[in-house]
Amino acid sequence: MTLQQLVRPNILAMQPYTCARNEYSGEARAWLDANENSMISGLNRYPDPLQTEVKCRLAGIRGVDVANIFLGVGSDECIDITYRTFCRPGVDNVVAIEPTYGMYSVCAAINDVEYRPVLLHDDFSIDEEALFAAVDANTKVLWICSPNNPTGNAYPLEQLERIASRFEGITVVDEAYVDFSTIGSMVPRLQRLPRLIVMQTFSKAWAAAAMRLGIAYAHSDIIGIFNNVKYPYNINILTQREALKVLDAADEVARVAGSLVSERNRCLLYTSPSPR
């Protein structure tokens, strides 16, 4: 399917809201276009609706283009906007591995979308045939959390690419815990998988859960539609400022995550049953 066939018709047809900050990108000594109070400084101006500075920093760290990044109020907004963009209420369905992160099913219920869980194998690996057996003509999204919450295992990138290539809808790989995995990220594979969305977050390795900032990486056409669907100023200025400070510590975050992985492996070694 093409992206135009996957997106809800009303979303494709809508005229997106344009705010004052979208309509003028230059510099000015005075701003009168949004009825902001100019007598008090600090928090009186609307924030950048596209969070350009934060995205530029993320693009450099993850090796993608700014046009491939969407920022949401936590990953939960990224999850919800996926439903609102692609799934027709009362008509379409989604398929997800089970057990997994609970917000996929919660957002499905909120958006009146049928949720089809597919049990993992006993070793928590993906049952690909069962996964695709649950898919029908109205299946719009596959949800795969990797590393999976709550089982903790990450799935081989080759398997995830195979699934995303085979499925004709939108495949979402939720990488909230990717910084604690040795397998790596699906982000570098976005160029050859135009229907793939990769979600990440500031809440785990970045130790910034209070910011409520989630990330979706995808083809620029998907990101463009997300930007049309989202609320105009979804990421406030305080979050944007704090995110830039957090991103300054990228090297330290990588070091701490590596240390945690090393300690995790050591704990597993000492708590594993001894061979008999």
Regions found by a protein language model. Name each.
Residues 1-61:
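N-terminal "arm"/small-domain region of PLP-dependent enzymes with the aminotransferase-like
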Residues 88-144:
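PLP-dependent aminotransferase-like
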Residues 55-93, 111:
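Phosphate-binding glycine-rich loop
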Residues 35-37, 76, 101, 147-150, ...:
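Short glycine-rich anion-binding loops that position phosphate/pyrophosphate groups of nucleotides
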Residues 109, 126-137, 150-208:
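Active-site pre-lysine segment of PLP-dependent enzymes
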Residues 195-269:
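PLP-dependent aminotransferase class I/II
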Residues 270-276:
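Conserved small/polar residues in nucleotide/adenosyl-binding loops
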